[in-house]
A protein has these predicted regions:
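N-terminal signal-anchor/first transmembrane alpha helix
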Residues: 1-28
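Periplasmic/extracellular loop-to-transmembrane helix junction in inner-membrane transport proteins
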Residues: 3-6, 30-73
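Hydrophobic alpha-helical elements at and bordering transmembrane segments
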Residues: 48, 57-61, 65, 95-103, ...
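Transmembrane-helix boundary motif in ABC transporter permease subunits
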Residues: 70-100
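C-terminal transmembrane helix and the adjacent membrane-cytosol boundary/short C-terminal tail
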Residues: 90, 147, 182, 224-261
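Generic hydrophobic transmembrane alpha-helix motif, especially the helices
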Residues: 101-137, 144-145
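Transmembrane alpha-helices
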Residues: 128, 132, 164-197, 230
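Short helix-to-coil transition segments within interhelical loops
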Residues: 146-149, 156-176, 216
């Protein structure tokens, strides 16, 4: 029954993309626009296959993936302990709340000109941009998870004689896990979005650079291939993240599934 339901869900998810491709085919056949503006699906597919067989696509995807993984892990290592510190210290949380709120509303790409001046046009400026975009959703979700632990559970743990360390390990962390996982998942998506923008401005490799280079050569078919590759990378990385977190953390969840699916 579950397999049948999954197949049905996949079919529904594919319905809209297939419909869009059919509309694209129809518009291409009517020759309303030149292929310079709107390439045919066949042109895009042909270029996609060529990029795979030539190895060009793997070069750019590999560089972007390496940057995303590095920054994502760094953001997680920084943001979760920081959330724990601010949860434990009310004074520190009040002191930092103004800066947190200010930079939460500043788009990371707005800082790119300054970061290029300070760090140069190499990897450091791109890493910094992606880090700033990734760290906030992880940090804010972790902070919410640690801060909103049910007071009744904590009180009950005190009554059973649990120490602060035991309460943190056996009450606070399991309660905060869904928030942390949600923040990590959002942060992973943000890391892809910000990286592509950073690579378009300051890079010599990566998917963003590849798309911008195609635009300068008036290759709209390659631009569309790049957009498709970004979407596929995001979908695959999100699915892999869900699989890993479900395997690692489902024992903490009563339903056996971190995402409740």
């Amino acid at each position: 029954m579950q397999i049948k339901q999954r197949i049905t869900n996949i079919a529904w998810k594919l319905l809209l993309p297939l419909l869009l491709i059919l509309i694209w085919l129809l518009l291409s056949s009517l020759n309303i626009w030149s292929t310079y503006i709107l390439p045919t699906p066949y042109m895009v597919w042909s270029e996609f296959v060529d990029c795979i067989t030539s190895g060009l696509i793997w070069k750019h995807v590999g560089m972007s993936l390496l940057r995303v993984v590095q920054v994502f892990l760094l953001a997680a290592v920084v943001s979760i302990p920081l959330a724990i510190v601010l949860t434990a210290s009310h004074r520190m949380r009040i002191l930092s709340s103004g800066m947190i709120e200010f930079f939460r509303h500043v788009p990371p790409l707005a800082l790119l000109p300054l970061l290029i001046l300070w760090l140069g046009i190499g990897e450091s400026s791109k890493i910094a941009i992606v880090f700033l975009a990734t760290v906030y959703p992880i940090f804010l979700n972790a902070l919410m998870g640690f801060s909103e632990v049910d007071g009744k559970l904590v009180e009950m743990a005190h009554q059973y004689g649990l120490s602060k360390k035991q309460i943190f390990l056996h009450v606070t962390i399991p309660y905060a896990i869904p928030y942390i996982v949600s923040g990590l998942r959002i942060g992973l998506g943000y890391s892809w979005r910000s990286l592509i923008g950073a690579e378009m401005i300051a890079a010599s490799s990566g998917i963003g650079y590849w798309i911008l280079d195609a635009q300068t050569m008036a290759r709209s078919d390659i631009v569309i291939v790049g957009i498709i590759v970004i979407g596929l990378c995001g979908i695959i990385s999100d699915a892999l993240f869900r699989w890993i977190t479900n395997r690692m953390l489902s024992r903490y969840m009563t339903g056996g599934d971190v995402y409740g699916a």
